[in-house]
Amino acid sequence: MSINAEEISTLIKQQIENFDSDIEVSDVGTVIEVGDGIARAHGLDNAMAGELLEFSNGVMGLAQNLEESNVGIVILGPYTEIKEGDEVRRTGRIMQVPVGEELLGRVVNPLGQPIDGKGPIETSKTRPIEAAAPGVMDRKSVDEPLQTGIKAIDALVPIGRGQRELIIGDRQTGKTTVAVDTILNQKDQDMICIYVAIGQKESTVRNTVETFRKHGALENTIVVTAGASDPAPLLYLSPYAGVAMGEEFMYNGKHVLVIYDDLSKQAVAYRELSLLLRRPPGREAFPGDVFYLHSRLLERAAKLSDAKGGGSLTALPFVETQAGDIAAYIPTNVISITDGQIFLQSDLFFSGVRPAINPGLSVSRVGGSAQIKAMKKVAGTLRLDLASFRELEAFSQFGSDLDKSTQAKLNRGQRTVEVLKQGLHKPMVVEKQVAIIYSLTRGFLDDIPVEDIQRFEEELNIWLESNRNELLTSIRETGNLPDESEFNDAIDSFKKTFLPSNN
């Protein structure tokens, strides 16, 4: 067989033309130390802070400490399979989570992976978990109310859309109940809710999700959970994952409520990571940047200007106190970042005042301008009346000789406390709240026995719905009080039909 020189040269030319000279360059390092969810790697000189890194077994890590000779990596998954000498490579990406309407009604972990057994989430959109907060010119004043459905909050410490309101109190004082009831009340309010459960028992989260489902609130809610048994990195990341999911809706002109339950556990997880990364400890062994941990999260809550779509993201962070000490490190940090706080007191809770809100220590710095006019008018003096009642109550224990005006204040105060009590998972629409608080502040309840107040409220609501529904509709649609003489007549008419239990 003769060799054809022409064929050979054609073949060589083809090979040269088809030669692919692409060279893949990847930054690869070596694990030099691993343990307790932290790895140190040598050779990743160009790694960026917060960059995702991939270990040889497919587990991802987050570059946290960029040191002279090595990189401190937080491992986002099981670390027992990673050993010294393993390869770790850069991805060039920062951590992102899936976002979009496909997540509504689902329970996910902080990486955005579904854990509710309902199959994969079909979304192609992602957002970085760390993002800059909206600037001054991108925001506008908080002017729309966020109705929680809880009388004590909507009347005394109103919350506006785009506000950050801290809910603070000891364990077992009803903090999570406030969150759940607020989400239940958003069902028909065109509001998307994100509930971030940080370091809670799986059984508690399951019960909460079941409550949302039972009351029809799950379809507009995303639940992000990092359980008590999850590694510290997931607890640390979960609030950022939740706010990133919320920002997707906010920047599309929608209204979002994000609840962080609770940030004390996130701070403890971050302290654990920081100490393992050998960062110098400060007060209460927290690292120096623990303030920034929470400020960069909560600053992402905003009411956007009309030019940016007019969306809003409202943040309700929770902080757990030890024996009512609100002057501890994390509580004072978060109080200084937020626009007000609602303080839940354990002795009020155990004496049957639920929600156990202490009106003296609770404040809303911007919510007042978002409160509807009708509520502002009827609840204007309520906080002061309640504070003076608490003071008088303490003094009245020492003597029985009280003048008439003091006795009248005590009587009104007892009825105020009774009106502000509310059952579990029973949020109330704002027009019905206005009706009962109007009855209280205008003296209609002064001669009703204290033990009958709650029955009076229930029956008044039913009577108004059946006989004078136009008054409730007027409050709901205009936000203003109806004509006072009409309102007085309606309540008077009902009062004549009401039978106190001592009759």
From Swiss-Prot:
Entry EC no(s): 7.1.2.2
SUPFAM superfamilies, A to Z: C-terminal domain of alpha and beta subunits of F1 ATP synthase, N-terminal domain of alpha and beta subunits of F1 ATP synthase, P-loop containing nucleoside triphosphate hydrolases
Enzyme class: translocase
Record: residues binding ATP: 169-176
Catalyses which reaction(s): ATP + H2O + 4 H(+)(in) = ADP + phosphate + 5 H(+)(out)
GO molecular function: ADP binding; ATP binding; proton-transporting ATP synthase activity, rotational mechanism
Function: Produces ATP from ADP in the presence of a proton gradient across the membrane. The alpha chain is a regulatory subunit.
Listed name of the protein: ATP synthase subunit alpha
Gene source species: Oceanobacillus iheyensis (strain DSM 14371 / CIP 107618 / JCM 11309 / KCTC 3954 / HTE831)
Organism taxonomic ancestry: Bacteria, Bacillati, Bacillota, Bacilli, Bacillales
